[in-house]
Regions:
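FAD-binding core/adjacent interface of flavoenzyme oxidoreductases
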Residues: 1-4, 64-141
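Beta1-alpha1 glycine-rich phosphate/pyrophosphate-binding loop at the start
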Residues: 2-72
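Conserved phosphate-binding and hydrolysis motifs of nucleotide-dependent enzymes
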Residues: 11-16, 104, 142-144
């Protein structure tokens, strides 16, 4: 797929980031738009549960030069729907010739009472870190 055209990538996590870099590395010359719901640039998620929870100075951002890649990066826009030709977000509509869905998953809340927190994104990690204190008791569900 080296010809022109418009590719829209919904999801600016590692999979979306890798999709746009791979397209360019394989010679795709068309328009690429990368859309992410988070306001941050793409970042690596594994450090969220390791370094970000314990260290203020960690930046898990992927080194992305969207200008050099000629990628239109739209942050803070959540995909809300699509049809065969257009991806809709909470801000705009993006026509495409090819669509890559790389939105990932959402956490599932467990039934029952109790305070549940999720570790899905950078802001979740910061919120959890703020709750940590000596003697805190917690249960961790999931090993993703």
């Amino acid at each position: 797929m080296t010809d022109g055209g418009r590719v829209v990538v919904a999801g600016a996590g590692l999979a979306g980031f890798r999709a746009v870099t791979e397209l360019r590395e394989r010679g795709f010359t068309g328009q690429i738009t990368l859309i992410g719901a988070e306001t941050r640039p793409p970042y690596d998620r594994p450090p969220l549960s390791k370094k970000v929870l314990t260290d203020d100075g960690v930046d898990p951002s992927l080194q992305a030069d969207f200008g050099a890649l000629d990628v239109d990066f739209r942050s803070g826009e959540a995909a809300t729907g699509m049809d065969a030709q257009t991806l809709a977000t909470d801000r705009d509509k993006y026509p495409y010739d090819r669509l890559i869905l790389a939105t990932g998953a959402v956490p599932v809340a467990l039934p029952g009472p109790g305070r549940q927190r999720f570790l899905r994104n950078y802001d979740d990690a910061l919120a959890l870190r703020a709750l940590f204190r000596p003697g805190l008791r917690l249960a961790i569900v999931g090993a993703g």
